[in-house]
Regions:
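Single conserved hydrophobic/aromatic residue that forms the stacking wall/gate
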Residues: 1-12
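N-terminal Rossmann-like dinucleotide/flavin-binding domain of flavoprotein oxidoreductases
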Residues: 17-29
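General small-molecule cofactor/ligand-binding pocket signal
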Residues: 30-32, 162
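A conserved short coil-to-beta-strand element within the FAD-binding core of flavoproteins
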Residues: 33-46
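Central helical "cap/lid" subdomain
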Residues: 52-101
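Active-site lid/adjacent beta-loop-alpha segment flanking the redox-cofactor pocket in flavoenzymes
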Residues: 95-186
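C-terminal catalytic lobe of FAD-dependent flavoproteins
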Residues: 151-247
Length: 247
């Protein structure tokens, strides 16, 4: 029924983040920008606070939710996680008149496209395929992604690309996230969302808040625990992880 898809579209991610930040600020949450975490204070297996570039912050509970930087901070806690960090690129074209009012995805070709409110065609797809913390990628991946785009929309060949950029993704080994407690009392983990975490922001935040406040996982994230990688109870997500078992 075509009526079921009416009203669907894309969301400007920065505006969503700003909306959450504004509401959090109104509720008394301190948001400290340009503040790098440099270490953690752990005493007798309990978290006592964090060390930052702008001073120490004492806390009985700490939530680690830093996407592609997860392994960097985990190493400071002597934790080894089943996470790999990869670069994911995107690009935008010169603006054109409105022609797409939603998002089109090409699963087999690993390509997606939408149109911004300024008229640019926003496109992306595959990971760069190697481990990196650099927030930039290589041209061959963009060429590969746009080849898939041309298969869907040949007119794209006549457009100029304005810019490309990259972000670092925390890729779990089975393609599913981790929302759980850790072996350190008071330290909680939310990571492994790969390249699809934005759309899950509301439920991710809600279940993570419950896990921190109650010191126990919620029913909704009970299967997203860290120990599934040691027990073998991995989640079947169509091989959306990093595919490290493929030679």
């Amino acid at each position: 029924d075509s009526s079921e898809s009416r009203g669907l579209g894309d969301v400007y991610k920065r505006q969503v983040a700003w909306g959450y930040a504004r509401q959090a600020d109104d509720m008394g949450v301190d948001i400290i920008q340009h503040c790098e975490v440099t270490g953690f204070d752990v005493v007798n297996g309990k978290i006592k606070g964090i060390r930052t570039s702008r001073g120490d912050i004492k806390a009985k509970k700490v939530g680690l939710c830093v996407a592609g930087s997860t392994n960097i901070l985990a190493e400071k806690l002597n934790m080894t996680l089943p996470i790999e960090t990869h670069v994911l690129q995107a690009c935008v074209s010169e603006p054109v008149k409105p022609l797409l009012d939603g998002v089109v995805t090409f699963g087999a070709g690993h390509f997606y496209i939408s149109q911004s409110d300024k008229g640019e065609m926003v496109m992306g797809g595959d990971l760069d395929g190697y481990n990196s913390y650099a927030q930039r990628g290589n041209l061959p991946t963009i060429q590969h992604v746009l080849t898939g785009g041309l298969a869907l929309f040949p007119f794209l060949s006549r457009l100029k690309m304005l810019r490309t950029w990259g972000g670092i993704m925390d890729m779990s080994m089975d393609g599913s996230p981790i929302i759980d407690k850790t072996h350190i009392e008071g330290l909680y983990l939310n990571c492994g969302w790969c390249y699809g975490g934005f759309k899950s922001t509301p439920v991710s935040g809600w279940t993570f808040a419950h896990t921190i406040a109650q010191d126990q996982v919620h029913e909704l994230n009970s299967e997203l625990r860290l120990n599934r990688f040691s027990t073998g109870h991995l989640l079947d997500e169509k091989g959306l992880g990093t595919k490290t078992w493929i030679g």
